[in-house]
């Protein structure tokens, strides 16, 4: 038995409504995973971050709920540096050893996504990574609860949700 954390994505009989309904009809009974591992270079701020995922023949569906404070979000362009905003990341590896996909989204619903074939760090970034194109991103359904840019940083407690499909 492995000590590697695992989450089994269940098949859904109904497509989510993309309304952020964490406990709604589609998402309510879906098992939750909590984010417990953080990048070593990140700040000491550790908001309570939970996620759920489902799939059907059309797409993979992901929802995140974040209990946060010190929220800042300024990036609004596809593949911009959302890592500098309040954001979440979803990684998956369709076939072991054949690369992985990284979907990073800020609380405004701004996406930074790529297919990583070689994760080796170079001065320019990763060894080989192909960013999602605008026409591909347009095929995704996205919901975000934060309506617009958050600047300056908001130090008040807030809960934010992002929900999206990956066709």
Describe every region a protein language model picked out:
Residues 1-167:
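Structural preference for beta-rich elements and adjacent junctions enriched in aromatics
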């Amino acid at each position: 038995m492995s000590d590697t954390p695992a989450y089994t994505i269940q098949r859904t009989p109904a497509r989510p409504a993309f309304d952020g309904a964490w406990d709604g009809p589609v998402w309510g009974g879906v098992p939750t995973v909590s984010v417990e591992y953080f990048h070593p270079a990140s700040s000491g701020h550790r908001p309570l971050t939970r996620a759920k995922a489902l799939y059907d023949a059309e797409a993979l569906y992901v929802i995140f709920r974040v209990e946060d404070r010190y929220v800042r979000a300024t990036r609004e362009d596809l593949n911009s540096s959302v890592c500098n905003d309040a954001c979440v990341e979803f990684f998956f590896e369709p076939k072991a050893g054949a690369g992985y996909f990284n979907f990073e989204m800020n609380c405004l619903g701004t996406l930074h996504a790529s297919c990583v074939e070689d994760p080796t760090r170079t001065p320019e970034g990763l060894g080989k990574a192909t960013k999602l194109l605008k026409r591909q991103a347009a095929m995704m359904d996205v919901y975000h609860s934060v309506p617009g840019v958050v600047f300056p940083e908001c130090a008040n407690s807030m809960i934010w949700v992002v929900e999206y499909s990956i066709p």
